[in-house]
UniProtKB/Swiss-Prot annotation:
Any single GO BP term: detection of chemical stimulus involved in sensory perception of smell
Pfam family, one: 7tm_4
Carbohydrate attachment residues: 5
Keyword check for Zinc: no
Function (record text): Odorant receptor.
Top-rank lineage group of the source organism: Eukaryota
Record's keyword terms, sorted: Cell membrane, G-protein coupled receptor, Glycoprotein, Membrane, Olfaction, Receptor, Sensory transduction, Transducer, Transmembrane, Transmembrane helix
Name of this chain's protein: Olfactory receptor 2W3
Source taxonomy: Eukaryota, Metazoa, Chordata, Craniata, Vertebrata
Length: 314
């Protein structure tokens, strides 16, 4: 357990809020409710997108994948978090930590790239409306999703092993409640300059590059919308992008605030609460944003519910 290399460890201890049991009990209830709502909301989006023929379009194809990502992302960490919050056992096995880190890096990378793909989809829909279904054909949509998953997995395969193999000189206490990569790097008893440089390069490719692409896509969208003469037409065009833009702002705003500010300017508690927001609140809000702001999704939900009622009457 106290070997000099991370690969010989059998477990890690997630300290989290273990020094404040009263806070753990409150967090357990709040996180459990949020997790259940996340499961219901994202599962509903997936089912509605697949069952309603009116939603068999590229936009909802990508939205279903985003909901699946959110489901996978929360399920990869929240059950373990709830287990640790509910009892005295704060440990996580080395293998469990490795799996969680791999999923965290992989799914996070996929979501960054998928949001960029969704921005491109909205750009084509507004800038090339007459050619939209030709350009965004099923083959291209499947190809784009496959590329995002491939890049996310490659990013995780590149970063997870080197992070887990860092020598920790017997240290196995993680000052966090999740297997966050920066927390694992801080445990190392050797220089981490090389791995931090690698992390920065990969972050530019997987996180910042999609953000730049999203901003460029929306610059084309804004220019195209401003050329629409009618106010109702402009409002409708902006409305089709509103939900996606809100999700992008929520996702990237949280990442930038967590990782781009100086370490001395934020406390450990603040960092942990931000990570909670990133892992729980964002996946919870995504289906609400798309449902509340989207008439097509609300209409599809209504049709499915009415259909079930009619079948029940028969």
């Amino acid at each position: 357990m106290d070997g000099t290399n991370g690969s010989t460890q059998t477990h890690f201890i997630l300290l989290g809020f273990s020094d404040r049991p009263h806070l753990e009990r409150i967090l357990f209830v709040v996180i459990l409710i949020a997790y259940l709502l996340t499961l219901v909301g994202n599962t509903t989006i997936i089912l509605v997108s697949r069952l309603d023929p009116h939603l068999h379009t590229p936009m909802y194809f990508f939205l279903a994948h985003l909901s699946f990502l959110d489901l996978s992302f929360t399920t990869s960490s929240i059950p373990q978090l709830l287990y640790n919050l509910n009892g005295c056992d704060k440990t996580i096995s080395y293998m469990g930590c490795a799996i969680q880190l791999f999923l965290f890096l992989g799914l996070g990378g996929v979501e960054c790239l998928l949001l960029a793909v969704m921005a491109y989809d909205r750009c084509v829909a507004i800038c090339k409306p007459l050619h939209y279904m030709v350009i965004m054909n099923p083959r291209l949509c499947r190809g784009l999703v496959s590329v995002t998953w491939g890049c996310g997995v490659a990013n995780s395969l590149a970063m997870s092993p080197v992070t887990l193999r860092l020598p920790r000189c017997g240290h196995h206490e993680v000052d966090h409640f999740l297997r966050e990569m920066p927390a694992l790097i801080r445990m190392a008893c050797v220089s981490t300059v090389a791995i931090e440089g690698t992390v920065f390069v990969l972050a530019v490719g997987v996180v910042l590059s999609p953000l730049v692409f999203i901003l460029l896509s929306y610059s084309y969208i804004v220019r195209a919308v401003l050329q629409i003469r009618s106010a109702s037409g402009r409002q409708k065009a902006f409305g089709t992008c509103g939900s996606h833009l809100t999700v992008v702002s929520l996702f990237y705003g949280n990442i930038i605030y967590m990782y781009m500010q100086p370490g001395a300017s934020s406390s450990q508690d603040q960092g942990m609460f931000l990570m909670l927001f990133y892992n729980i609140v964002t996946p919870l809000l995504n289906p609400l944003i798309y449902t509340l702001r989207n008439r097509e999704v609300k209409g599809a939900l209504g049709r499915l519910l009415l259909g079930k009622r009619e079948l029940g009457k028969e």
